[in-house]
């Protein structure tokens, strides 16, 4: 259940109560594709750096180790030793982005595994069953993420099919949640708004799915090559047509400036691999924007990554030392930078929540954008 606590302009401060705890929103979900953050970050680390929600990938876990294995091990929470909320995506995005050979039909999608090439089928019911086996807190509906740009006629047909799939997802989840051997029989379902960059298609789809009384609503199919202006335009068009008493999730968007702009437009949930991926390549976020620790100017820099930061890396190590670790190809380098970046994001969201609570979010946003100077 979502409770709206405060608004600052259109920015929303809320609480989302789940079977695995209360999520303070706006929130950034830390992405652990295979039930772990790439970069040797443990579930204990995630708690230390303020992670509220972990996100895992249905498609990848279905292939390895297999959702049946996870179910036999008691579900994702027990498997990865994490007692806070977990969101699993539906696998739809990976089916359409990773598989070069796929066939879309009304019942679902036939595609080839990106690992061994074997033929796999996934539809709404299969996605729900896999996510039920994983026993995540929040399951995402199975949808088609169309390429951008895509012909209007195709987008219209795709959105209609995605709506039919959403009804099937809801029916299947209700069935699964009623079974005696279901680990999490209070699993929640978020629907996904699609429609490419066509505002009218997006709006009609938002109105349609808003009637279904789901636990939350996502805006999908963005951050796939469109301009930031197009992204903001679509968010502006869609958000007013989604229920105000449900959380709104902008999928796959994680550039800090994009997060601020989306919060300013009423978005509550975010996720992205960006902070962890950047950290693994020595790109770290600071109050002044993003820097590359491999640059020669940091060789003798005895400052922490970001002065004043309370993450494990900044409390104990210098830019010079971490740069040396990267040059020496030591795994500790990746770990420290991933921890720092995730802490930066989680702390950013805490500052955003405080700014909305204090009704100074607009001023906060403008100050942060000025500090970053287009470097974040």
UniProtKB/Swiss-Prot annotation:
InterPro entries for the chain: ArchSynthase1/Queuine_TRR (IPR050076), TGT (IPR004803), TGT-like_sf (IPR036511), tRNA_ribo_trans-like (IPR002616)
Pfam families named among the record's database cross-references: TGT
Keywords: Glycosyltransferase, Metal-binding, Queuosine biosynthesis, Transferase, tRNA processing, Zinc
Cofactor(s) demanded: Zn(2+)
Keyword Metal-binding in annotation: yes
Pathway assigned to this chain's UniProt record: tRNA modification; tRNA-queuosine biosynthesis
One term under GO cellular component: cytosol
Active-site positions on this chain: 89, 271
Gene Ontology terms for molecular function: metal ion binding; tRNA-guanosine(34) queuine transglycosylase activity
Enzyme class: transferase
Stretch list, region RNA binding: 252-258, 276-280
EC number: 2.4.2.29
Function as written in the Swiss-Prot or TrEMBL entry: Catalyzes the base-exchange of a guanine (G) residue with the queuine precursor 7-aminomethyl-7-deazaguanine (PreQ1) at position 34 (anticodon wobble position) in tRNAs with GU(N) anticodons (tRNA-Asp, -Asn, -His and -Tyr). Catalysis occurs through a double-displacement mechanism. The nucleophile active site attacks the C1' of nucleotide 34 to detach the guanine base from the RNA, forming a covalent enzyme-RNA intermediate. The proton acceptor active site deprotonates the incoming PreQ1, allowing a nucleophilic attack on the C1' of the ribose to form the product.
Record HAMAP family: Q_tRNA_Tgt
Family note: Belongs to the queuine tRNA-ribosyltransferase family.
Subunit-level organization: Homodimer. Within each dimer, one monomer is responsible for RNA recognition and catalysis, while the other monomer binds to the replacement base PreQ1.
Name of the protein: Queuine tRNA-ribosyltransferase
Source organism of the structure: Clostridium botulinum (strain Loch Maree / Type A3)
Top-level taxonomy: Bacteria, Bacillati, Bacillota, Clostridia, Eubacteriales
């Amino acid at each position: 259940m979502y409770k709206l606590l405060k608004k600052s302009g259109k920015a929303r401060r809320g609480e989302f109560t789940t079977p695995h705890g209360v999520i303070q929103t706006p929130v950034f979900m830390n992405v652990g594709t295979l039930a772990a953050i790439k970069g040797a970050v443990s579930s204990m680390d995630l708690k230390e750096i303020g992670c509220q929600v972990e996100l895992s990938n249905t498609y990848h876990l279905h292939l390895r180790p297999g959702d049946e294995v996870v179910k036999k091990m008691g579900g994702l929470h027990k498997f990865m030793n994490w007692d806070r909320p977990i969101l699993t995506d539906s696998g739809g995005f990976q089916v359409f982005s990773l598989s070069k050979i796929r066939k879309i039909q009304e019942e679902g999608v036939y595609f080839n595994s990106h690992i061994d090439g074997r033929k796999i089928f996934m539809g709404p019911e299969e996605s729900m069953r896999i996510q039920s086996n994983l026993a995540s807190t929040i399951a995402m509906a199975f949808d088609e993420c169309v390429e951008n740009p895509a012909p209007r006629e195709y987008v219209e047909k795709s959105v209609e099919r995605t709506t039919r799939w959403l009804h099937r997802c809801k029916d299947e989840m209700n069935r699964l949640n009623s079974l005696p051997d279901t680990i999490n029989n209070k699993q929640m379902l978020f629907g996904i708004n699609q429609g490419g960059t066509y505002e009218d298609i997006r709006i009609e789809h938002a109105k349609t799915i808003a009637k279904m009384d789901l636990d939350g609503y996502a805006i999908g199919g963005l951050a796939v090559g469109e301009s930031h202006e197009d992204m903001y335009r679509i968010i502006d068009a869609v958000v007013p047509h989604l229920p105000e008493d449900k959380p709104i999730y902008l999928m796959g968007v994680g550039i800090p400036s994009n997060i601020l702009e989306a919060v300013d437009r009423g978005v509550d949930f975010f996720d992205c691999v960006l902070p962890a991926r950047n950290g693994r390549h020595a790109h770290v976020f600071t109050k002044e924007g993003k820097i590359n620790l491999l640059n020669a100017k940091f060789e003798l820099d005895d400052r922490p990554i970001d002065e004043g930061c309370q993450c494990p890396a900044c409390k104990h190590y210098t830019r010079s030392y971490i740069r040396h670790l990267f040059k020496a190809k030591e795994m500790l380098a990746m770990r420290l930078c991933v921890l720092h970046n995730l802490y930066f994001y989680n702390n950013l969201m805490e500052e955003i929540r405080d700014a909305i609570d204090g009704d100074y979010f607009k001023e906060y946003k403008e100050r942060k954008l000025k500090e970053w100077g287009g470097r974040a």
